[in-house]
Structures are given as C-alpha cells and as structure tokens.
C-alpha cells in the first residue's frame, strides 16, 4: 500500500496569484478547511511546498 498524506486548506485563495490558485485546484482543494488524502509523491510534496501559507499536512499515513 502506498504512503499517503492528509492535506488541509488553511488559507483563502482570494487575492493570491493565479499560479497559487491553480496549485490548490491541482491538489483538489477549493474551500477553506477541506481535507484531501493524497499519495505521498514528490510532485504532491512540491505542490504543498509551493503554498505552505495556504495548506498544512495534517497526517502522514503508511
């Protein structure tokens, strides 16, 4: 079974650059305080690291 991470949106995309909004949509997030369980891959980690002020990693699962 693949490792996964649970990502939660903690910031609003209002008045943020379009690139940051697109990154949120790429992670499957669009509303405040929503969570998503995503595969722990380098591409997902990179997207999370691009917008640390908008998302947080809640949990890492095996």
From Swiss-Prot:
The keyword Ribonucleoprotein applies. One of its GO terms (biological process) is translation. InterPro entries: Ribo_uL30_ferredoxin-like_sf (IPR036919), Ribosomal_uL30_bac-type (IPR005996), Ribosomal_uL30_ferredoxin-like (IPR016082). CDD domains: Ribosomal_L30. GO terms for cellular component: cytosolic large ribosomal subunit. Keywords: Ribonucleoprotein, Ribosomal protein. It comes from the Bacteria. Part of the 50S ribosomal subunit. Belongs to the universal ribosomal protein uL30 family. NCBIfam families: rpmD_bact. This is Large ribosomal subunit protein uL30. The gene is rpmD.
């Amino acid at each position: 079974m693949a490792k996964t991470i649970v990502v939660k949106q903690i910031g609003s995309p209002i008045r943020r650059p379009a690139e940051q909004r697109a990154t949120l949509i790429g992670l499957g997030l669009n509303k405040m305080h929503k969570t998503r369980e995503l595969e722990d891959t380098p591409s997902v980690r990179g997207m999370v690291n691009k917008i640390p002020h908008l998302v947080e990693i809640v949990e890492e699962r095996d």
